[in-house]
Amino acid sequence: MNATSQHPFALPYPIVENRLVVGGIPITRLAERVGQTPFYAYDRRLISERVALLRSALPSDIHLHFAVKSNPMPAVVQFMAGLVDGFDVASGGELKTVLDTAMPPEQISFAGPGKSGRELRQSVAAGIVVNVESEREVTLLAEAGASLGLIPKVAVRVNPDFELKSSGMKMGGGPKQFGVDAEQVPDLLTRIKALGLDFTAKCR
């Protein structure tokens, strides 16, 4: 019997003879091939189709970046490197994973509050863009750059003074843990310029 899962959130994997089929291979055979259960299985064709569908709905000058925290599995990240225009990471571990791909460092960005001094130094050495979220991070990046003989690449993650009412996620509108409050941005940009950091402006 052939069937397709009707679960509203399930990927369209077929079911053949009561066995889920992923990438044309029955799940039972995949388990034998992996050698253990549980395990994760992904269909490269479906991933490619989803990315292509998203691109078709967006203007051609929009760049797609994959948030690695959504799925940091190395095999998935390696595959995504050939489909998207860049990576966004949120930890030193994620950065290490993406640096093992063919993605150019300038297309990798590091965002998230509470970055450690070691992670910031790692970022400068790798030549990626760091989305700074505090004056502390700017200072640590400048120190790392001076020590390594490199110019840190930075952007500023701005916490705007307004809130999107239709969004379920509230990452703007008054003080938040994410980003620099809008009223503090001019002073921070002045400091970035004074320290000689390589600033880039982006819209995400």
PLM-predicted stretches and their roles:
Residues 1-146, 150-152:
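A charged N-terminal "starter" segment
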Residues 1-3, 8, 160-204:
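Active-site loop/helix belt of alpha/beta enzymes
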Residues 62, 152-154, 199-203:
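Residue-level recognition of the N-termini of beta-strands and the immediately preceding loop/turn
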Residues 151-163:
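Glycine-rich, aromatic-flanked loop segments that form ligand/cofactor-binding clefts
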